[in-house]
């Protein structure tokens, strides 16, 4: 989650959700009576309805929320309500409209009575779920930064100080510089618990850094991308590119793989500290025992309305006890395994004997 602005006087928070997890998180904080402003498409009829033409017109609307629906299958949040602000020439004010919010779509959320600090903290916690590290480097400068939902923080920067192209020591100095930059980047990635590292720059130095990084860090995706320069300017250029959003979404898949691997490890060695199937995980959530929860997106759209309601209550229970909640697509290899385990799995804070429901 990228948090762009918090205005407590106006009761406004401006955010950009970046993953399905972020979309679900928004569904838990947006409530009836809130005001939500976002870009949208509205079908406008010209001439007499039925005989005239109609077009879907892009516009920015503010709605007073009446209903919020999280659609995990489409990774969208549907926000339905009465339009209270919009272009006058289209006559949309006072009519119903549904905003469709997906990853990458900026929105303003206004709570007329003010944002409770607990909800702001909830958004901030969510914005720290996934971290990426960017190293932007060329033959002159480098910078290393951590990228989270709250923004970009430069943690290291400097010059390569290479001798001239005709200097016989240039290649050795370049190798030394690459080693230092790669080690610095690896240290940042480990310290920030990053799931991916992007090596960016205009030339070949970024490739050398990426190659060195692959030998220094494990379990971290290394991505290489082209930007026009190294240093801090290169970092911010990289962050503005859409590839970062896709990388963060890919990182969420890596996180799901990590949870499944830990689940399988505990299944063999600590079976009391896992739960699977909706019933088991729900019971664990009631006890406050869920540490991390991984749920299949299609589980939220079960054909049985009672099951859907049970899933919704499970998510709210888990959230209330500060469990980390993750979603995974049924079309992914991880999703295929989670489906075979009942559509939802959990890592537990302590062991539970589900036969007798006693802690251990």
From Swiss-Prot:
Top-level division of the source organism's lineage: Archaea
Q: Where in the cell is it found?
A: Cytoplasm
Q: Does the keyword Nuclease apply?
A: yes
Q: Name one GO molecular function term.
A: metal ion binding
Coarse class of the protein's main subcellular location: cytoplasm
Please list the GO biological process terms of this entry.
nonfunctional rRNA decay; nuclear-transcribed mRNA catabolic process, no-go decay; nuclear-transcribed mRNA catabolic process, non-stop decay; ribosome disassembly; RNA surveillance
Which cofactors are required for activity? a divalent metal cation
User: SMART domains in the record, alphabetically?
Assistant: eRF1_1 (SM01194)
GO cellular component, alphabetical, reads:
cytoplasm
Q: Which cysteines are joined by disulfide bonds?
A: none
Q: What is its EC number?
A: 3.1.-.-
Query: What UniProt keywords apply to this chain's record, in alphabetical order?
Result: Cytoplasm, Endonuclease, Hydrolase, Metal-binding, Nuclease
Keyword hit for ATP-binding: no
> Could you tell me what this protein does?
May function in recognizing stalled ribosomes, interact with stem-loop structures in stalled mRNA molecules, and effect endonucleolytic cleavage of the mRNA. May play a role in the release non-functional ribosomes and degradation of damaged mRNAs. Has endoribonuclease activity.
- State the family named in the UniProt similarity comment for this chain: Belongs to the eukaryotic release factor 1 family. Pelota subfamily.
Q: What's noted about domains in the record?
A: The N-terminal domain has the RNA-binding Sm fold. It harbors the endoribonuclease activity.
Instruction: Describe the subunit structure.
Output: Monomer.
Protein name per UniProt: Protein pelota homolog
